[in-house]
């Protein structure tokens, strides 16, 4: 079984996807980290994330072992990911890796959970379960603010909110694989939900899907 979890930044999709994978003993892939790793590799190489040639080279040379790098959780990595993720050649280079993970989960797992922006629409349109996780931009900005401040970053809420809106616009407006809700996806608004409530709601969605099949 393939479970596709999509949604904008700080919607809670990553936390939900990880907990869902743990609960079901499925393999888990945070596809956003692939783009963060590419973006940071470009920056470390002294290039600009907008440089398509440098970004493509980084995508082709991506080492999955680098996905545990703490720098991938920084705001800089997030912004770079949004930029390189809008480059068609980069998305194409990472597509096979994601699809192979979904169809051949590592370590004999019975299924896979992937989270990102275009899992249900482009990467795994055949996924048996698709959930689009969202929340108001204000709630998402506040979540990101708390996350950054807890990491020791001195940031202003207005700046985080502005960056969040700009990132949403980039993710939804890119020419290739824009963030969109799949026609057969269930929308889960986590604005007023705890992580535990979101997990319960997702498990209910899975149970409902199982009953229909």
From Swiss-Prot:
SUPFAM superfamilies in the record, alphabetically?
P-loop containing nucleoside triphosphate hydrolases (SSF52540)
Q: Would you name any one GO CC term?
A: cytoplasm
Q: Name one GO molecular function term.
A: ATP binding
Q: Is Ubl conjugation tagged as a keyword?
A: no
Annotated residues that bind ATP are located at 7-15
* Compartments where found: Cytoplasm
- Pfam assignment, any one: Cytidylate_kin
Q: Which family does it belong to?
A: Belongs to the cytidylate kinase family. Type 1 subfamily.
Q: What is this protein called?
A: Cytidylate kinase
Name the species this protein comes from: Rhodospirillum rubrum (strain ATCC 11170 / ATH 1.1.1 / DSM 467 / LMG 4362 / NCIMB 8255 / S1)
